[in-house]
């Protein structure tokens, strides 16, 4: 929070991920889903710290300029950014194979961040949601197997609020 002098008393935390076509998502993935997903994976990292996301930087490598693709990509990114009050404050574009790098910055009160360093032998391990679902869907798609629901891969749900609620109650 702010003290009476307007001094900001939070720590800045960051998460960064790069997603590459054919590696992290199939080549036929909708642009909307790519935009959504590239922000979601970073928000999940901040959620794991218990942080409140604030700002994002987005760098795109695109094989060619495509206004329709960019509109759909932007709509997916913007949809999730608005849900979590994240402002896109900068980035870069270049020509090359499709690759997206996102850095998300957030805030947390000093000493309240969740870190793996706090885990101890004998601690209770609790997982929210399912683990490995997105990787399973991606593996099935790469193997040419039918997938009835791609949402775990294309539009994962970052648990930002849960991470914030766990501050002071969990160690990692």
Feature-to-residue mapping (PLM):
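Helix-biased detector of long, well-ordered alpha-helical tracts
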Residues: 1-172
């Amino acid at each position: 929070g702010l003290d009476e002098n307007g001094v900001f008393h939070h720590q800045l935390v960051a998460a960064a991920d790069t997603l590459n076509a054919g590696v992290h998502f199939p080549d036929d993935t909708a642009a909307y889903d790519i935009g959504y997903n590239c922000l979601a994976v970073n928000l999940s990292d901040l959620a794991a710290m218990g942080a409140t996301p604030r700002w994002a930087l987005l760098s795109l490598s695109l094989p060619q300029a495509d206004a329709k693709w960019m509109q759909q990509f932007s709509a997916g990114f913007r949809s999730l950014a608005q849900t979590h009050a994240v402002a896109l404050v900068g980035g870069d574009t270049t020509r090359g194979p499709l690759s997206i790098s996102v850095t998300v910055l957030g805030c947390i009160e000093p000493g309240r961040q969740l870190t793996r360093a706090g885990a101890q032998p004998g601690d209770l391990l609790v997982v929210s949601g399912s683990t490995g679902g997105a990787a399973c869907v991606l593996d099935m798609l790469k193997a040419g197997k039918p997938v009835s629901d791609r949402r775990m891969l294309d539009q994962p749900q970052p648990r930002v609020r849960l991470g914030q609620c766990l501050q002071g109650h969990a160690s990692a």
